[in-house]
Structures are given as C-alpha cells and as structure tokens.
Amino acid sequence: HDSKRNGKKYLFDLPVRAESYFSSKEIRDVRWPEDVLVTSIRRGQQNVVATGKTVMQTGDVLHVLTDLGLAKTVQEELKQLEKRQIFDT
C-alpha cells in the first residue's frame, strides 16, 4: 500500500442497505480496511459527524475518506465486507 499513498485524498459515498453488514453496527465494531476514515454520515436531511460510537443505520450514506491511490482497492474491499452476513463475524 505504501507506494499508492501520494498525499491526495479521495472521498466517496457508501450507502448502508438493509441487508448490509454495516447496518446496526457501531463504526468502531467494523474491521475497516487500512487507511479508511468514515468522516460523516448523511442521515435523511442531516449530516452527522461520525465517531466510533456512531451506530450506522439502514438508509445512511457514509462519507468515506481514503488515499486516492488506494480508492479502487478500498472500494472493492468495502463491497466484499458489506456482503458479509451479521452472523459471519
């Protein structure tokens, strides 16, 4: 990963679907890929500052920050993680 860190950042949206692994979990309870930061959450019409104790809810849109060079890899890792079932921890 070191060669893909160039100081430039990439911010993208990650929706939380009903069947998502992220739904009903606190941010700190997820094993996020390296170099990922959930900065805030759009919840309805509000933007919520994300902390480790923030519980992600169905319908939320996570604002995720990572290094630009890692963006594709991180997005793929998050897609795989999102598909995990709640009992598969």
Q: Over which residues does each language-model region extend?
A:
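Membrane-interfacial segments at transmembrane helix termini in multi-pass membrane proteins
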Residues: 1-10, 75, 80-88
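Cytosolic Rossmann-like ligand/nucleotide-binding regulatory domains
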Residues: 13-77
